[in-house]
Structure formats: C-alpha cells, structure tokens
C-alpha cells in the first residue's frame, strides 16, 4: 500500500518537472515586417497587346507534296511540327490536297520514306490480297488506313480494321479464301453476277444464256433419245431465233411430265399433210401416258399451236398399269365436226394415293360422292377420283409412232368383226344378234326392232365412226345419249372392257335443264346418222 503511494508521488514530481522545463525553453518570437515601399504608376501608359500574334513557321508543307527523307532531321523543315520520317514497308496509296485545295492521289512504293505527321488512330494490318494501305488526310494529320479493294466481296468492320470480313456471294454462295484469290463459290445451279448499284457480287440462278455454248448442257446433233434438234419443225420458232444455233439438242418438251417434272417416253411430233400443219405430243398409251392440252402455254411454250389444237404435254399419273386400278372409265363425245381427227374425251379413274407416281398428283384427287354405275354400293376405303381430260389427242401424226389412247380408240372403233370391236351396251337396233359388234343397219331393220321389241335403237355407225341412230329429241325425255362410256380401256378384246355404255341427258341434268341439253345436242350435225 505504501509502495503504491510512493509511486504516485514520484509520478507527480516528474510531471511537474517536465512542465517547468517546457515553459523554460518556450521562447515567443514575433514576425518582423519591414515597411513596403510603394511606387506611383499614375503616369505609366497601359499595355495594348495586338489582337493576333502570328508565329512564323516553316515555309514548306510536307502534307501538300510528298517530301522524301532519310532521318527525322530531314522533316524539321516541314511546317507540320509532328512530322517524322516514315518508312513504308508495303506499297501505299496516299490522298492529299495540294496548295490549291485539289485532291491528289499518289502511290508510295515499298521501301520509300517520306515526312508525315501520322495520327495515332491507324490500322494495324492490311491483307494485300483484299486491301491496300491508304494515307488519308485528317484534321490532325494523316491516318494510315486499310482500303478494301473489293468491298462488295470482302469488307472491314470499321475504317481501322483489316479487310477480312466476307460479305459477297450470298445467299446462294460463299467467298472462298480471304486473300488475293478471293472468289465466289456458288451453289449448284447458280452463277456469279454483279450488282452495279451496290457493287456487290452475288450468285443468281443459272439461265439459258449462261450455258448457251456449253456442249455439256446443250449437246450438238445427232441428238440422243429424249432430245430434239433446235430446228425441229415442231418446236416454237422463238427458241430458234433466240439461240441462233440450229444443230444443238434440247430436251424434248413432250418427254417431261409437267406435274412431276419426271422424264417420260412422250415425244414431239410434226405432221404436215393436205395443207394442214400440226405440232404436238405423242403419248404412248402402253407406257401409261395421257395426252393433255395446256392452254396456258399454248402460244408461249416450246410446242406451238398449229392449224389444229392438239395435246402439248404428256402426263404419267400412276406408278402401276392403268388396268390395275379399281375403275377406269373412258368417256367421249362423238358429235364434233373433227371427231375423226381430234379426241373429245375424259378419263375418270378410281385410285388411291399409293398408286400415284408423284405426290403432286394428290391435289388432283377428289373424294367419292356416289357409287360407280357398275357398283351396287359405295366402296369407301382409300379410293379417290381422278379425272383427266384427254381431249385434243389426235391421229394426225406418223402412223409408225407408238399409239396414243385416241389412236387405239379409233383403230378399234372402225372394226365390225368380233372379238376386236365395240359392243352395244344399250338399245336394240336389230331383232336377231343385237348384241354383236356395233354396225349400221337398214332403216327397215331398225323400225322392226323398235316396233316389236319395245326398245330404242341407240348405237349405230356412220362409216368408221360410232354415232347415235336418231336425233336427241326423238328419244324419251331424259333418255337421249349425251356421252358414251367405256368401262376400262380397250387394250384387249375383253367384252366387258369393249362395251359402249350410254350417259343420258337425265343422268346429267334434271327438269328444264334436261330439255335444254337435248336441244343443244341436236345442234351438232354429227350427232346422229
């Protein structure tokens, strides 16, 4: 306890001694400020500095004319204070303005040195195959840029980047190699072209003029099967005038199915006889081809319209033989004046999608709405109806060509001896053997059959052509023949397939329309014998 009190006393003594020492050495000094002498400037004139101070520079401007140099010291004579001696490793183009302000261009060769004040903003690289160095004058000096040689083919992201961004040839091609040999590589069926407005190369679809002299595309005569010479008389003269080369071979227009685009055995023909010229397509029935007339290309297509309107295309709708289909009906009208030369017929099929030769034919299928005349009930299943007009098929062509559907019909139509003939499917024109081949009978025989059998004579013939016996108005109302029908084709001598059935006016119209249709039929001079 006494020890602690002793320590506190000693501490107090030490503090007091330190305080006294500090007060002893603390001397107060006051700043001595001498008096400031003032001068009277009342009579001194004021300074009047000039409005503009001009510092004379060097007379020579290195940015107005190229100034060669060896060292930086050579550029001290330049008015441009930041000019240095610049060595160029590559050929560079420079654009500057002369003393009169006119823009001038010059080329600096690799290895040459000139005085320039270069901007720090500059391109770091420049592909010599796609660009060239360019010194472009700016407000602060010259900027070293990479100028693209073919910006429509290979360009740059900005003015300070290299020319290494391919942009041309799209969308049907691409740029091959970003260098001196940069070029467009186009997709199959396309060729290179150039858009002068945008200065951009692009790939466009190949046209005839691109392959006009390419013998791999247009061979020279003699032509292979499925091709015809351009000077074929059955081709449109327009193509001959356009090509101006008569011995080249082109695809036979009749050998291409216009719906599927596939090649067929259809062939172009030209027929000239008795002052009549006919150009058209021969479509062999044995190959499942159907002749059609496309009015949309009748005047502008490869097959021109001649003195007769005939088929100008061949369709191949099925991948099976037409006799293998569920139903086939050949419906024809016999009363037109040119019935011996040109067909007026439709072919109606019942088929399913699996029997079509190409999916594009699906759009031509229609659902069954009623049963077939020879069916007792409607068979739904997958069957659909496909109707194709084979009108304008003709016999005005070389008889050595494979026969078309109408040619086969006309050959059998003229026959009057079994089994290769057409049989009557309705009416009775003779008392005995009335179901034999359709023949022309004497008026007395017909009167006897109609009187004593209570039947009407319907089918007869006028020479080689099958016609109706009486005028349409003579038959009972609704019973006048309006069209004739063959079930199936007449490719063989099967009686069922060669029996001619009648489509009456009552099957096609009703009420007053039946009477109107009957009157129209009587306007055809070839309607009856």
Swiss-Prot record:
Task: Report the domain of life of the source organism.
Answer: Viruses
For this UniProt entry, which residues form the secretion signal? Answer: 1-20
Q: Which UniProt keywords apply?
A: Signal
The keyword Signal belongs to this UniProt entry's keyword annotation: yes
InterPro entries on file: PIR (IPR007784)
Q: Name one Pfam family in it.
A: PIF
Q: What is this protein called?
A: Uncharacterized 59.0 kDa protein
């Amino acid at each position: 306890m006494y020890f602690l009190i002793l320590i506190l006393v000693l501490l107090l003594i030490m503090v007091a001694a330190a305080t006294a020492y500090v007060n002893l050495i603390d001397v107060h000094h006051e700043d001595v400020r001498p008096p400031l002498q003032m001068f009277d400037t009342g009579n001194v004139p004021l300074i009047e500095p000039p409005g503009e101070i001009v510092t004379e520079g060097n007379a020579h401007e290195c940015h107005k004319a190229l100034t060669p140099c060896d060292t930086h010291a050579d550029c001290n004579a330049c008015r441009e204070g930041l000019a240095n001696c610049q060595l160029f490793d590559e050929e560079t183009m420079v654009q500057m303005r002369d003393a009169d302000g006119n823009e001038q261009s010059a080329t600096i060769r690799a290895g040459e040195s000139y005085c320039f004040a270069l901007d720090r903003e500059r391109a770091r690289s420049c592909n010599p195959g796609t660009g060239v160095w360019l010194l472009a004058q700016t407000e602060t000096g010259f900027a070293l840029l990479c100028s693209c040689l073919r910006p429509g083919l290979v360009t740059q992201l900005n003015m300070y980047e290299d020319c290494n961004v391919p942009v041309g040839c799209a969308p049907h091609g691409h740029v091959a190699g970003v260098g001196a040999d940069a070029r467009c590589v186009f997709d199959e069926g396309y060729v290179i072209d150039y858009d002068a407005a945008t200065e951009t190369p692009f790939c466009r679809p190949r046209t005839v003029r691109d392959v006009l002299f390419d013998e791999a595309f247009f061979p020279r005569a003699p032509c292979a099967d499925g091709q015809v010479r351009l000077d074929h008389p059955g081709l449109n003269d327009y193509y001959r005038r356009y090509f101006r080369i008569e011995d080249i071979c082109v695809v036979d227009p009749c050998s291409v199915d216009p719906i599927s685009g596939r090649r067929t055995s259809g062939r172009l023909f030209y027929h000239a006889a008795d002052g009549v010229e006919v150009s058209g397509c021969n479509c062999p029935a044995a190959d499942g081809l159907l002749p059609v007339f496309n009015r949309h290309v009748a005047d502008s297509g490869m097959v021109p319209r001649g003195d007769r309107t005939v088929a100008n295309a061949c369709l191949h709708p099925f991948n099976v033989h037409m006799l293998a289909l569920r139903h086939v009906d050949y419906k024809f009208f016999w009363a037109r004046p040119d019935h011996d030369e040109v067909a007026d017929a439709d072919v109606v099929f019942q088929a399913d999608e699996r029997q079509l030769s190409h999916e594009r034919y699906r759009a031509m299928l229609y659902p069954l709405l009623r049963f077939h005349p020879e069916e007792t009930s409607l068979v739904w299943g997958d069957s659909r109806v496909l109707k194709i007009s084979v009108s304008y098929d003709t016999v005005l062509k070389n008889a050595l060509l494979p026969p078309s559907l109408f040619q086969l019909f006309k050959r059998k139509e003229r026959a009057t001896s079994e089994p290769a003939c057409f049989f009557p499917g309705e009416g009775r024109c003779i008392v005995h053997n009335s179901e034999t081949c359709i023949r022309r009978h004497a008026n007395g025989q017909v009167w006897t059959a109609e009187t004593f059998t209570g039947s009407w004579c319907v089918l007869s013939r006028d020479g080689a052509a099958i016609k109706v016996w009486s005028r349409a108005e003579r038959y009972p109302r609704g019973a006048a023949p309006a069209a004739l029908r063959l079930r199936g084709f007449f490719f063989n001598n099967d009686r069922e397939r060669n029996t001619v059935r009648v489509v009456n006016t009552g099957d096609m119209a009703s009420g007053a329309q039946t009477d109107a249709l009957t009157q129209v039929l009587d306007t055809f001079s070839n309607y009856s014998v």
